[in-house]
């Protein structure tokens, strides 16, 4: 029997650490950045197979803390360098990795499903990342999801 995204997220153990959450969502997150596994590997100075192994999940391989830190540095640098076209990436990381406790289960499910819908187009055409990010925000707003923690962070960032 196929389990829904809602069920999977609802049953997520709140004690799961950020390393595990990043590993679980890495394929989607790198797609939101517009990167293939090979592109992320190049940015990290590792082989594509290393990224593929990490993305296979914790049953086959558990990402190390050092790998987590390296991946986060690359992601955070990308967000800082391109704030206008990485909003979707920022919100996905915030909701699924950094602060899932700030979102309801329904909001996380909606964020995940909408990001999965748009992320493949970003990988195919990275120059369309900004328009995909804007479309993602519009879709979330239309579906009634309030990205409260993410919105607060963006508003705070603009004041700085």
Model-assigned labels for residue ranges:
Residues 27, 34-36, 55-56:
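Long, helix-rich, hydrophobic modules that act as membrane-proximal anchors or helical bundle/coiled-coil regulators
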Residues 38-42:
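Short alpha-helical "recognition helix" segments of helix-turn-helix
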Residues 63-83:
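DNA major-groove recognition helix of helix-turn-helix/homeodomain DNA-binding modules
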